[in-house]
Amino acid sequence: MMLRLTTMRPMLLAAVAVMRCPSAVAFVRPPTLRYASGVRHAVSSRRLPRMSSLMEDVMEDTAPVINAAGADVRVRFAPSPTGTLHVGGARTALFNFLQAKNAGGKFILRIEDTDEARSSRESEESMLADLRWLGLEWDEGPDKGGEVGPYRQSERGEIYKEMADKLVEAGWAYPCFCTEEELIAKREQAENKNEAPQYDGTWRDADPAEVKAKMEEGVPYTYRFKVPKGKRIVIQDLVRGQVAWDAEATVGDFILLRSTGVPVYNFCVAVDDAQMGITHVVRAEEHLTNSLRQCLILDALEFPRPQYAHCSLILGEDRSKLSKRHGATSVGQFRQQGFLPSAMKNYLSLLGWNDGTEKEIFTEEELHEAFDLRRVVKSSAVFDMTKLKWMNGQHLRALAVEELVPMVGSTLVEAGVCKDAGGPFVMSAATLVQGSLELVTDAISQTQDMLGYKFDETISSEESTELVGDGFSEVVAAIVADFDAGEMPKPGAEDFSPAFKKWIKAKGKALTRKGKRLFHPIRLALTGSMSGPDIGEQLKLLELASEEGVENVSLAARIETLKAWLATQE
């Protein structure tokens, strides 16, 4: 269950008592974090400074950052289960996964489900299935456990309560009783003055007696973080270089806990990253401004900051942020369309990263070895569907036919082309289409084209005009004559392939044709197409189709079509 504000009322009343008597302030000792590797990262035990002096001084940003060279790399992917896994999220997961693989570290899966209204376990399961399809297996997560769990934010309420207590006790957080109407009015006033709409600190230094009275009346309140005056936050982003903010001018005192008692996103993330020992936070640039709030929280709790790497957004071909209007955007959609997980990973890895060469096709092992966050670029990447399909085709052609057959077989069975997903027919079809596939689903139309016979359509097309005018009827007549005389090799014979090649060679001599003038008319006559896989292998496919009860236009039926066409040429 999520932390509820009412559980903190006794603690806050005690804090109000302390506010009445500053000399009685009892500072808390910062906690020690235990990491899954068994290494304990002790946070400095020095007492926190008094808030009065802290707020008055201009502070240099000297917060400690985790030394990646001296600690086991721990990265995380933290999706919100409110929909499907978007390709942008998949790329973030991939970059984290590859960083862990390259460094011999751990890849953590954390579910950020604090939005109770929109989050669902169904969405979570869908995302986990998509990650597994991509081969991005995590080392710790909600279904695997680990030493720093729970791994769902909705189950980490006690942890957030403990950290919130520490912030309040140390003077880093305070209750705000402003109503929504008052906050709206403040925003409007700021906008009318052309000022940034920030909280004006109404309750920041409120009289403790007034705070206590409000609480005893049961007036709803939020907790706000007390942003230090003059505080400058600086991070050395691994992608974007140095990024700095004037904290007070940028965010003002922000909410930590809502009036419902539910912690806000940035508070949960900061606490989780620290408690889980995350060394590198790799995420999209839209989270860059969140780093300011998270660093303030981490600094207040005296936790070391992780290394940040904010990757540019993925854009559509019109240079706007990739969205549904650009077509498929979820991993599940690409999976259904027939893309390979290896191709998806290869393509997504190149959306913002390269290995410093012109190399584009990577195996999974090569990606594990080559990936380096320092080679992720600042500029936005454009999602090019044509390039993705080309890359998928490269990966399909790199498969052993034994790996391709199950994919093609299940695809053809699902489409109703055949019933046996692993028989000789599918083996033959997979072998024939492998060289021209971009998607596994392309096997459906390409196989159906080979089983069908579009002779009449092709012969009347402009594409075939030159071929027909070059004595095509003479070639057709020779084919028909040989078939009727039993001189054309039968596709079902064991020696069909060499016999068919020998037969074509003999036809070339008899008709004084060779090369394209020989093969192109024979292809059109026997397959009904101007291009395609090996002619003889296509005829063998027809025989296998007939044996397995797969609908096709047989060789005999094709010969009858040729005879009918010849009759029109007399």
Residue ranges and their predicted role:
Residues 423-497:
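Aromatic-anchored, charged helix-turn/loop surface patch used as a conserved interaction hotspot
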Residues 1-38:
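N-terminal chloroplast transit peptides
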Residues 75-81, 108-113, 276-281, 329, ...:
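Glycine- and acidic
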Residues 522:
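Hydrophobic, well-ordered secondary-structure elements that form the walls
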